[in-house]
Amino acid sequence: MVFSSFPTYPDHSSNWQQQHQPITTTVGFTGNNINQQFLPHHPLPPQQQQTPPQLHHNNGNGGVAVPGGPGGLIRPGSMAERARLANIPLPETALKCPRCDSTNTKFCYFNNYSLTQPRHFCKACRRYWTRGGALRSVPVGGGCRRNKRTKNSSGGGGGSTSSGNSKSQDSATSNDQYHHRAMANNQMGPPSSSSSLSSLLSSYNAGLIPGHDHNSNNNNILGLGSSLPPLKLMPPLDFTDNFTLQYGAVSAPSYHIGGGSSGGAAALLNGFDQWRFPATNQLPLGGLDPFDQQHQMEQQNPGYGLVTGSGQYRPKNIFHNLISSSSSASSAMVTATASQLASVKMEDSNNQLNLSRQLFGDEQQLWNIHGAAAASTAAATSSWSEVSNNFSSSSTSNI
């Protein structure tokens, strides 16, 4: 772009007379010259430049101060700014409150983003009102609510403390009532640790818990006398009266007292150590009669008899009727077995030992026979002695 130079004139009154002459300016655009002539007819006086009002930024809330605004604060983009741009006059700042007639009021905002509903606040009664709207009867303001909340919180704190104390007292009372109820019903609460469990068992075995004479109940059910020592670490059997086994005329619970072949379960019952019977594998094989050991045990303990299984004893008075009813069949079986074994000659010592062990195991499971079966028992005993003599003679001859 090529611009022609403008003639410069000193600031003198004679320069205004030369304004009547035309001024020729040449403006060239890429080699093209365009001549424009400006022919002003009358000189125009210099116009004063209108300066906009200075805007002072507010450091507190980012608003700007505008002359004539309510309080001098208008936020950019707010409803007041929109009202100013729309040339709507802002409401008066000091209006009378419709309730208390106080002039200590201020304009807050336009309600519902509508320029026709300006909202005001009265600092005296702390209430809001909107022009053209209903008056609010509920006081709205931070000061009153803060004071009320502070008073309520202080009073509420005392109330919460008293309520907490009452709750703790109620819980303590309920715990005491539960404890007394448990003691009245002879029930103990769940143990909290192993020490409390051990103390409970010790007090139970010692008979410290009232209403539970479990030793006498156990002795009565098992057919034991009151002279026998109490059964330690044994659960009470008075709760199992309705659980019985029906064998004809016999109606009694079946409790196996003692251990198996190793006798491990009998060690838990301290009161039955003297009635334990030796295991099957500990019996000698030659020259001994198992019925002699049975008679010796019965003489020491007349209230007990041998029960099916190794090392198990049980009261004879419970199963007396059962033995009496099956005495004839047992005697016939013993006689037939003895007669058959008497006619057999063994050639191998291993077979003799196995047969004798089987015989001992079968005959050991027989119970004591009373009444009319005494004669058959004597015959079986004599047959057993003959069989044992034949075994010893045949074994010596084979050796």
UniProtKB/Swiss-Prot annotation:
One BP annotation, GO: root radial pattern formation
Q: What is its main location?
A: nucleus
Q: Phenotype of the disruptant? A: Narrow and down-wardly curled leaves. The pear1 pear2 tmo6 triple mutant variably displays reduced radial growth. The pear1 pear2 dof6 tmo6 quadruple mutant plants showed a greater uniform reduction in radial growth, associated with compromised symplastic trafficking.
Dof-type ZnF = 95-149
Q: Where in the cell is it found?
A: Nucleus
Pfam families noted in UniProt: Zn_ribbon_Dof
Binding residue positions for Zn(2+): C97, C100, C122, C125
Keyword annotations for this protein, in alphabetical order, are: Activator, DNA-binding, Metal-binding, Nucleus, Transcription, Transcription regulation, Zinc, Zinc-finger
Residue ranges of the region described as Disordered = 139-176
Q: State the PROSITE patterns in the record.
A: ZF_DOF_1, ZF_DOF_2
Q: Which InterPro entries match?
A: Dof, Znf_Dof
Q: Which tissues does it occur in?
A: Expressed ubiquitously, especially in the vascular tissues, except in seeds, petals and anthers. Specific to the vascular tissues in young leaves, cotyledons and flower buds. The PEAR proteins (e.g. DOF2.4, DOF5.1, DOF3.2, DOF1.1, DOF5.6 and DOF5.3) form a short-range concentration gradient that peaks at protophloem sieve elements (PSE).
Q: Which domain of life is it from?
A: Eukaryota
GO cellular component annotations, sorted alphabetically?
nucleus
Recount the UniProt induction comment for this entry: By cytokinin in procambium.
A GO molecular function annotation here is: DNA-binding transcription factor activity
Describe the function of this protein: Transcription factor that binds specifically to a 5'-AA[AG]G-3' consensus core sequence. Binds to 5'-TAAAGT-3' motif in REV promoter to triggers its transcription, thus regulating adaxial-abaxial polarity and influencing leaf axial patterning in an auxin transport- and response-dependent manner (e.g. IAA6 and IAA19 genes expression). Probably involved in early processes for vascular development. The PEAR proteins (e.g. DOF2.4, DOF5.1, DOF3.2, DOF1.1, DOF5.6 and DOF5.3) activate gene expression that promotes radial growth of protophloem sieve elements.
Task: Tell me the protein's name.
Answer: Dof zinc finger protein DOF5.1
Q: Which organism is it from?
A: Arabidopsis thaliana (Mouse-ear cress)
| Protein's gene | DOF5.1
